[in-house]
């Protein structure tokens, strides 16, 4: 190696080396960039760094390590290969890239040599370790230790390092120089009689800024040799040098044959532009939190043992090693040599430089190939470490495995180093051994990835319109309402009626008056007369029986007049008005009365309001028009019934008379008017789920004869759905196939005979054969290559059915999606609903010959349970566009998909069997396997602890803190949402939840309210379940984190339940626990409290909810409070008119609730976690006792007579005075009653603890008694018990009272 004479001028950085004798301190530039790695060698041979020529090699074999100089020749070094011997081996054809670390080390040796020549004695170099002289950890004898001062000297040795003695001898002329005539320069060191080799290596590849600029002096081919022993001679050979000072990722190779058991390697993604930033980051910034020594700013030594396992995960096994520069051995710490690195120093006094020549040595190519083969073998033998189950690590692993090259190859100028990941693994390994069990899982962060995954999958599985789906998560768009004015734009005759369609969707009632006439001329005349009449009546505001506001909206009226608006062709009533009516008609009429009224208007269309517009036509003797108007009115009645069935089918699930009346009306009157419309309405009953709800509620215990009266054997759709929910479905094997959701032939026949009271087996086989031919069920031989009907193997999985039936070229298809669930098939892998064209929820409405759809709608998913006693809300309606009859025909044209929909099935999961399945005949055999097809739901993958996989069915192996907070939030949301879906509008009528018989009348709403209160007490129970304050702090922090996640899930109801639990008096009084919560989490908690605060009538919450987001679980207490105040208004006005303004306000609340029921959370149910979340909770009184046992109030308390004073002090840790103890121990003495009473009075009147450190001042206790059996009983003062007040307050809010 060439060493310039003026190496003194090389920049030094913070070289604070303690030294003996006359060693001077180096310059300090406040940069800790000096790293010298020294490894020990037991051999007596000299390990040297040499520069050799081809002529001869003179080796200094003296026992004393020395630096010899041979100044014999001055040669040009252009044609010589510089070999660097490291640890006794030669790395040929390698280019050194050295930064300030090596230059400072060389400068140190040069100064040591100069001082040695002048003083003729040995120089000792003191090396401090961790600011002290101490030994390396015994368990990590190969782990480098870091010095807190500069230069950092990393020493690998088992002994205690106190000093490093450098004995420097000059054998020849006494100068340090470069001998280019063939002699070697030996740099040897003695350390406690051991021969050490200098191993200059940096912890990471050096970058551009580490290079020292070179001053290339051309034609400078002579070495400066003189008789001065203190000079350093060198030759600057840069005439034809191709050295590159800007090479990135330079690395120093270490011989693989020596010390191959190194336990650490390089790699990882720490983004640093240069080594100076890296050293500052590693040494100065306290990034890696120290465990053993708080003042250390470097990773602890034990962390190095983890680096190997951590780094290897970032090196794909398929990495291709193409060159020495791209070679990366994960089992090595030393860096590779890459390209040319010149070390030079440009000063005002000299242009000398320290160069490393970049000449190719072809003789070393074979050695390089051998090294590459060894590295490839190591990569192939490398075993990956088992990774964590967290989503973030999974994503990190996927992104790493997807790349074909290592990070060093992809980014040679930017080496990454993931210290955060390493440190988490290091903490995990230590915590499993030393930390308590509740600190095992460290769940920290905002969990944006998991939350986004949950909401994204919920939206992808849902059936909301695209406009509503865009209003999810962070897409804060304004609430959109359907405002389709297609008919108004296409029909200029209705321009005067556009004012009645503000913020409403077009209804069939609007379109029926404009598009169904024989000729254009006649239509114009009829519409003009109707419009004129309507305008006069609305302008005069003098309609008998109706009252309008300034916006031409009905605010009051008689019952018959309001119903007449839906059938009056002279009025244009939007869908919103119809929805408001259907939501609130229970206030002034029964469902039977409404159906009777609609039947009367269907059979006698020319009545009431219609007579006013018909009288003009009778004068002109236009009988054709009268018949057409009668048809329009009947179609309007059908439209009302259609909306009633699709969106309010819950009304037919509780009243057998109503259901039977509806079926009779459809089979009789509607079928006689239009057979196709009758079939459509009957299908709508099945699709809306009201039939299944009716069976679940009313026919669960009924006889089979009654069931057959309701469902005929021709109604294959209903039979298929009922079978899928009642018949036990299992996973069966047939040959090499595994068929899910399957049943045998004999099971189906037996079920059908028992349920429908069939006389013979042939009748059951005939019905099942029709279902098989209609693709409602499938034979196992036609399951195809892909059959996994159920979406998951979870014990209970909610699925929905979504299919579509094709429509004709002149027909507009309306997709009606519905879903139902039952609890009978939990063993088959889910709550299921069959999917086929006839049993699917998709159907086409009867359409007209002119290509327009007569009645279309889209109902969105709703889920029911056969075990529930009441139904739930059906789905939100996306209203129709137009309706009418063309060519004067009274019978609309219905596509074949309605009358014969059984041949248009479409499976969403399995490959649909071919049409050849129609040739199958159902066989009554136990070996014949059939199955249902269900939709595959894209559920987010559960995040469960590792112990869950070892014992998934055991609830004792995992605790609350072992579960990921995101998964806890998911399961809490799933539990509450299942209860939320079961609510129906009838549960909210007349504040039924506040009545004494609420449990019998509205059990679903009461269960939902009780669940919210249970969550509050469960939160308090989990916090108070341990007397260890660290455990309580961990649980409290976890609940704050879960609350933040629920806020992002838009689960406001569960969020408020957790906040109320944290606000209970038994929790608020835990002063020491609250003091351990950091300010960041307290601020986050306060923000959540402000959002859900009832201040200004929940103004903050209402502002957040002003923009609808889906999915969402709203805070039910706000709706109950609004309904409570609305109900204070009268149902009828003084003149006997219905207060329809009140009905509009009620319907607004109910429509909003219904809207959030249409888009559900698609989550997997995990029973083990649900059992933990539904664990036993303590009562309010028990919670308060437990709270005082954990943290005693700082006041005097009474003690039972049979308890010794010492036991009391030990048990309660309460400061009591001797006088009080003596008085309390004399309770059996009647003479001391007065004294005891006085003491109790004094205790009650004593001041409460200061609230400065606690969020809410703790409530004082009148007395606490410890009985003989070590049980604690407390006498609480009702006036001072804040927890009891909190309970009353929470119930007050949930019931919506003032």
Curated annotation (Swiss-Prot):
Residues 211-245, 315-384, 483-501, 508-533, 783-864 have a biased composition (Low complexity). PROSITE patterns: DEP (PS50186), RASGEF_CAT (PS50009), RASGEF_NTER (PS50212). Residues 352-389 form a coiled coil. Keywords: Coiled coil, Guanine-nucleotide releasing factor. Residues 473-482 have a biased composition (Polar residues). It comes from the Eukaryota. InterPro entries: DEP_dom (IPR000591), Ras-like_GEF (IPR008937), Ras-like_Gua-exchang_fac_N (IPR000651), Ras_GEF_dom_sf (IPR023578), RASGEF_cat_dom (IPR001895), RASGEF_cat_dom_sf (IPR036964), WH-like_DNA-bd_sf (IPR036388), WH_DNA-bd_sf (IPR036390). Residues 723-801 form the DEP domain. The keyword Membrane does not apply. Residues 550-689 form the N-terminal Ras-GEF domain. GO terms for biological process: Rap protein signal transduction; Ras protein signal transduction; regulation of myosin II filament assembly; response to cadmium ion; sorocarp development. GO terms for cellular component: cell cortex; cytosol; nucleus; plasma membrane. Residues 1-26, 46-88, 211-271, 314-384, 459-533, 781-864, 884-920, 1214-1267 are annotated as: Disordered. The keyword Kinase does not apply. SMART domains: DEP, RasGEF, RasGEFN. GO terms for molecular function: actin filament binding; guanyl-nucleotide exchange factor activity; myosin II binding. Residues 964-1193 form the Ras-GEF domain. Promotes the exchange of Ras-bound GDP by GTP. Seems to play a role in chemotaxis. This is Ras guanine nucleotide exchange factor Q. It comes from Dictyostelium discoideum (Social amoeba).
């Amino acid at each position: 190696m060439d060493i310039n004479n003026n190496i003194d001028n090389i920049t030094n950085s913070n070289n604070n080396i303690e030294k003996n004798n006359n060693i001077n301190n180096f310059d300090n530039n406040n940069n800790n960039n000096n790293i010298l790695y020294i490894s020990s060698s037991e051999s007596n041979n000299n390990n040297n760094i040499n520069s050799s020529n081809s002529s001869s090699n003179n080796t200094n074999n003296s026992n004393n390590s020395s630096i010899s100089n041979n100044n014999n020749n001055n040669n040009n070094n252009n044609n010589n290969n510089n070999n660097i011997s490291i640890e006794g081996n030669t790395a040929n054809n390698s280019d050194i890239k050295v930064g300030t670390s090596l230059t400072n080390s060389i400068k140190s040796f040069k100064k040591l040599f100069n001082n040695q020549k002048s003083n003729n004695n040995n120089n000792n170099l003191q090396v401090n370790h961790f600011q002290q002289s101490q030994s390396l950890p015994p368990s990590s004898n190969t782990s480098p230790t870091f010095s807190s001062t500069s230069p950092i000297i990393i020493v690998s040795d088992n002994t205690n390092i106190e000093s490093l003695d450098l004995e420097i001898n000059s054998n020849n002329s006494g100068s340090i120089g470069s001998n280019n005539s063939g002699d070697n320069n030996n740099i040897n060191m003695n350390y406690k009689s051991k021969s050490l080799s200098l191993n200059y290596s940096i912890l990471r590849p050096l970058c551009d800024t580490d290079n020292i600029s070179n001053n290339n002096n051309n034609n400078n081919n002579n070495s400066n040799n003189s008789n001065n022993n203190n000079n350093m001679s060198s030759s600057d050979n840069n005439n034809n040098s191709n050295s590159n000072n800007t090479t990135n990722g330079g690395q120093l190779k270490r011989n693989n044959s020596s010390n191959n058991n190194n336990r650490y390697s390089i790699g990882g993604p720490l983004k640093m532009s240069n080594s100076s930033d890296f050293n500052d980051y590693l040494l100065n910034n306290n990034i890696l939190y120290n465990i053993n020594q708080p003042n250390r700013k470097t990773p602890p030594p034990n962390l190095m043992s983890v680096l190997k396992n951590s780094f290897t995960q970032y090196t794909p096994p398929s990495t291709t090693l193409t060159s020495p520069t791209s070679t990366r051995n994960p089992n090595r710490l030393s860096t590779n040599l890459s390209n040319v690195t010149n070390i030079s120093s440009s000063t005002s006094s000299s242009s000398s430089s320290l160069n490393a020549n970049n000449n190719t040595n072809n003789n070393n190519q074979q050695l390089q190939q051998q090294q590459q083969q060894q590295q490839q073998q190591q990569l192939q033998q490398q075993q990956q470490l088992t990774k964590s189950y967290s989503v973030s690590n999974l994503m990190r692993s996927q992104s790493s495995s997807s790349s074909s090259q290592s990070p060093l190859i992809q980014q040679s100028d930017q080496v990454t180093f993931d210290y955060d990941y390493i440190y988490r693994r290091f903490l995990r390994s230590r915590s499993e051994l030393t930390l308590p069990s509740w600190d095992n899982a460290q769940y920290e962060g905002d969990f944006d990835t998991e939350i986004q995954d949950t909401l994204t999958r919920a939206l992808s599985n849902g059936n909301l319109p695209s406009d509503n789906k865009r209003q999810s998560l962070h897409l804060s768009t304004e609430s959109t309402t359907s405002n389709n004015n297609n008919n108004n734009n296409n029909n200029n005759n209705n321009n005067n009626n556009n004012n009645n369609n503000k913020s409403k969707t077009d209804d069939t009632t609007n379109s029926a008056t404009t598009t169904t006439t024989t000729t254009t001329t006649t239509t114009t005349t009829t519409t003009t007369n109707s419009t004129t009449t309507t305008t006069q009546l609305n302008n005069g505001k003098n309609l008998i029986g109706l009252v309008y506001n300034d916006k031409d909206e009905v605010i009051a009226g008689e019952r018959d007049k309001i119903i007449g608006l839906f059938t009056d062709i002279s009025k244009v009533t939007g869908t919103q008005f119809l929805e408001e009516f259907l939501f609130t008609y229970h206030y002034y009429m029964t469902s039977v009365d409404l159906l009777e009224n609609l039947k009367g208007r269907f059979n006698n269309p020319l009545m009431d309001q219609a007579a006013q517009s018909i009288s003009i036509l009778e004068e002109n003797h236009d009988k054709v028009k009268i018949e057409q108007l009668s048809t329009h009115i009947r179609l309007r009645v059908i439209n009302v019934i259609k909306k009633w069935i699709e969106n309010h089918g819950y009304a037919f699930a509780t009243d057998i008379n109503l259901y039977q009346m509806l079926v009779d009306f459809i089979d009789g009157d509607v079928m006689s008017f239009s057979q196709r419309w009758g079939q459509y309405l009957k299908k709508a009953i099945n699709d809306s789920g009201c039939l299944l709800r009716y069976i679940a509620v009313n026919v669960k215990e009924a006889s089979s004869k009654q069931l057959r009266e309701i469902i005929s054997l021709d109604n294959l759709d209903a039979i298929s759905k009922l079978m899928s929910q009642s018949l036990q479905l299992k996973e069966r094997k047939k040959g090499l196939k595994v068929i899910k959701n399957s049943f045998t032939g004999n099971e189906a026949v037996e079920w059908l005979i028992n349920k429908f009271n069939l006389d013979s087996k042939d009748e059951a086989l005939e019905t099942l054969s029709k279902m098989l031919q209609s693709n409602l069920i499938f034979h196992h031989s036609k399951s195809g290559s892909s059959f996994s009907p159920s979406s998951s193997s979870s014990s209970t999985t909610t699925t929905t059915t979504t299919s579509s039936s094709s429509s004709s070229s002149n027909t507009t298809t309306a997709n009606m999606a519905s879903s139902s669930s039952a609890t009978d098939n939990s063993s088959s892998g889910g709550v299921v609903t069959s999917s086929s064209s006839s049993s699917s929820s998709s159907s086409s409405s009867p359409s007209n010959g002119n290509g327009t759809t007569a009645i279309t709608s889209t109902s969105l998913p709703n889920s029911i349970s056969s075990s529930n006693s009441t139904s739930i809300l059906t789905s939100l309606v996306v209203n129709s566009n137009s309706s009418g009859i063309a060519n004067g025909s009274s019978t609309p044209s219905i596509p074949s998909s309605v009358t014969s929909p059984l041949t248009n099935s479409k499976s969403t999961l399995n490959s649909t069997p071919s049409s050849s399945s129609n040739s199958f005949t159902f066989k009554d055999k136990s070996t014949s396997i059939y199955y249902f097809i269900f939709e595959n739901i894209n559920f987010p993958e559960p995040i469960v602890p590792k112990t869950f996989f070892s014992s998934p069915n055991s609830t004792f192996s995992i605790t609350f803190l072992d579960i990921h907070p995101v998964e806890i939030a998911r399961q809490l949301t799933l539990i509450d949402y299942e209860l939320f879906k079961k609510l129906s509008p009838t549960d909210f009528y007349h504040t039924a939840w506040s009545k004494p018989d609420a449990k019998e009348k509205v059990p679903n709403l009461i269960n939902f309210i009780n669940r919210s209160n249970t969550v509050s007490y469960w939160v308090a129970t989990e916090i108070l379940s341990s007397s260890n304050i660290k455990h309580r702090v961990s649980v409290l922090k976890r609940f704050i984190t879960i609350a933040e996640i629920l806020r992002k899930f838009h689960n406001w109801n569960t969020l408020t339940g957790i906040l109320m639990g944290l606000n209970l008096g038994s929790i608020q009084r835990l002063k020491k626990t609250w003091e351990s919560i950091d300010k960041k989490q307290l601020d986050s908690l306060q923000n959540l409290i402000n959002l859900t605060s009832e201040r200004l009538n929940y103004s903050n919450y209402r502002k957040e909810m002003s923009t609808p987001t889906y999915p969402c679980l709203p805070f039910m207490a706000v709706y109950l409070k609004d309904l409570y105040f609305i109900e204070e208004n009268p149902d009828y006005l003084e003149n006997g008119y219905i207060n329809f303004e009140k009905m509009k306000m009620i319907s607004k609340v109910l429509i909003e609730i219904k809207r959030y029921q249409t888009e559900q959370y698609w989550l997997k149910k995990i029973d083990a976690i649900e059992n933990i979340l539904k664990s036993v909770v303590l009562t309010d009184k028990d919670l308060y006792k437990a709270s005082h046992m954990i943290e005693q109030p700082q006041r005097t308390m009474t003690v039972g007579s049979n308890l010794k004073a010492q036991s009391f002090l030990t048990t309660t840790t309460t400061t009591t005075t001797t006088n009080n103890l003596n008085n309390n121990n004399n309770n059996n003495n009647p003479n001391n009653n007065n004294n005891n009473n006085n003491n109790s009075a004094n205790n009650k009147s004593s001041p409460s603890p200061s609230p400065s450190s606690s969020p809410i001042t703790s409530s004082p206790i009148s007395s606490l008694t410890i009985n003989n059996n070590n049980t604690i009983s407390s006498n609480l003062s009702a006036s001072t018990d804040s927890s009891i007040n909190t309970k009353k307050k929470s119930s007050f809010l949930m019931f919506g009272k003032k």
